[in-house]
Amino acid sequence: ADLGCDFLASGTHKWLFGPRGTGIVWGRDWEPVAPIVPSFSAAAFNAWQLGGEPTASTADLVTPGGYKAFEHRWAMPQAFAFMMGIGKDRVQQRTQELATRLKAGLAGISHVTLATPQAPELSAGLVCCAITGMQPLQAVERLRAKKVLTSVTPYSHSLLRFGTSIVTTPEQVDLAIKAVEELV
């Protein structure tokens, strides 16, 4: 409610350290929303994404996805309790501190173009950039060899993506900056 949004949908394993593959949906007012049953059929999802009709067999389209992972649901209260025990303000401060450190370090490297805004109020723990003369996937592979884990953004214009969180140390941020400096 503090965000001022009407609905929020989010995965919970990255920011909350909840079970992988679990998410939440929160809504301010559910009355005007028609319930839907999500399909686990790749053909149905792809057809929806492309604005067409699914071509899968009837059996594939009506299978609801199997048995619920109750252990994931049961773990969510503990994940929220863990995060609330640390404190939302402390989590935000630590994540912002590390992301700011990373952005400042990357911005000072001549072959890096920072895509994430440097202003702390305009970003969170994800930091994205481009490396001059290098594809993002190539940078991921070269950084992995230096013990720095990154990923590629899943968009048509992809970027190199770093993530900071409360389990990231300042030393790991500095190692990432040094590894990027050595890429070219």
Task: Please report, for each region that a protein language model flagged, where it lies by residue.
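Short beta-strand-to-loop capping motifs
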Residues: 27, 129-133, 164
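Glycine- and other small-residue-rich loops at beta-strand/loop junctions that grip anionic moieties
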Residues: 14, 65, 165
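Active-site PLP attachment segment
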Residues: 3-50
